């Protein structure tokens, strides 16, 4: 059964997570030939300049960008970049909104008052970006690959390969472009210390199952995901079917019992009635799992556990893990 599910994951995840975005790059999308190396390849990017020193040339996913001075007017093109700059104490002058109706993550809302939108991640308003006179644009090859020539003509532009599981490498790249590499390293050191503290608070080694309900999809998340990286950093094991170097395994309501684990954490990307969560969670197969019978299945916030994509979101996930699993 495990081998079968893993094979299914490789094919099911072949649909581009660039979605219907014609400006994206499918090679680095889920199932693309460059997906699984995005973290190691991103780690090779950045600048050789001394910390905080400008001018500097930053190597990134689409080439090299020279920054003559420390940026002060930054525009971010996705929620990952938004979390990154805010985690460094920098408020962007403009931001692209997610395609989802939910908009920007609510956990960042108090820091975004007055920050204008520049379109959505897949439908940028280049005129609005130009009008804000940025001196740095942060985005990704996955989302805006084909717009890079136009964006880089507006302002120096630095692209990561893709959001998601390379979130720590992306954060260091953003810190490099902003001349905040020392602070970025400290933020990640503090994050790992927090993860170690969470691990110390948990008795034993419970296997953690991750279930996400989406419109037309039901996913069990693997290691190459934002939340998968966090669980690995904490040192918590995964059920065999999810302990894979893939974004996720796709199952069906009829095979939901493959989600069994010592603890099950689940969320819905959208309204539970629309994603199938309400029906599945009320059904007999869900109720038949031991974790559910014994009260060890817990609903969590989708926007932090699956959409956070940066250090601030990751810190909130750690808080959740400690609250739900700690002594």
Please report, for each region that a protein language model flagged, where it lies by residue:
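Short helix-initiation/N-cap motifs at beta->coil->alpha
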Residues: 62, 118-126, 245-252
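Proline-aspartate-enriched helix->loop->beta-strand connector
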Residues: 131-139, 156, 261-264
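Bacterial Sec-exported substrate-binding components of ABC uptake systems
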Residues: 1-79, 183-208, 270-278, 300, ...
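Alpha-helical, coiled-coil/dimerization segments enriched in small aliphatic residues
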Residues: 220-249
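A short, structured surface patch at a secondary-structure boundary
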Residues: 73, 79-128
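Extracytoplasmic ligand-binding site segments that recognize negatively charged/polar headgroups
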Residues: 100-105, 144-146, 161-173, 207-229, ...
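Structured C-terminal subdomain patch of bacterial secreted/periplasmic proteins
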Residues: 260-327
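Extracytoplasmic substrate-binding proteins
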Residues: 64, 146-215, 311-327
């Amino acid at each position: 059964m495990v081998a079968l599910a893993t094979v299914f994951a490789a094919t099911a995840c072949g649909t581009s997570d660039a979605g219907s975005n014609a400006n994206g790059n499918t090679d680095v999308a889920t199932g693309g030939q460059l997906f699984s190396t995005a973290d190691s390849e991103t780690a090779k990017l950045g600048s050789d300049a001394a910390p905080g020193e400008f001018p500097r040339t930053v190597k990134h996913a689409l080439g090299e960008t020279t920054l003559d001075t420390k940026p002060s007017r930054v525009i971010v093109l996705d929620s990952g970049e938004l979390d990154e700059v805010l985690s460094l104490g920098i408020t962007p002058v403009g931001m692209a909104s997610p395609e989802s109706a939910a908009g920007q993550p609510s956990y960042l809302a108090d820091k975004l008052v007055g920050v204008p939108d520049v379109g959505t991640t897949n439908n940028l308003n280049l005129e609005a970006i130009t009008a804000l006179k940025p001196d740095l644009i942060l985005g990704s090859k996955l989302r805006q690959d084909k717009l890079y020539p136009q964006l880089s003509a507006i302002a120096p532009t630095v692209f990561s390969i893709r959001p998601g599981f390379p979130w720590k490498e992306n954060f260091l790249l953003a810190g490099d472009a902003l001349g905040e590499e020392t602070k970025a390293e400290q933020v990640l050191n503090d994050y790992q210390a927090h993860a170690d503290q969470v691990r110390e608070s948990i008795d034993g080694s419970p296997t953690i199952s991750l279930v996400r309900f989406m419109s037309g999809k039901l996913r069990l998340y693997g290691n190459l995901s934002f939340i998968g990286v966090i669980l690995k950093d904490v040192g918590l094991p995964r059920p065999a079917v999810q302990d894979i170097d893939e974004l996720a395994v796709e199952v069906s309501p009829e095979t939901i019992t493959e989600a069994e684990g010592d603890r099950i954490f689940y969320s819905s990307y959208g309204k539970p009635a629309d994603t199938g969560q309400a029906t599945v969670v009320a059904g007999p197969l869900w109720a038949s799992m031991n974790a559910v019978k014994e009260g060890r299945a817990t609903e969590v916030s989708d926007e932090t556990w699956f959409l956070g994509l940066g250090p601030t979101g990751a810190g909130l996930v750690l808080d959740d893990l400690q609250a739900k699993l700690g002594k």
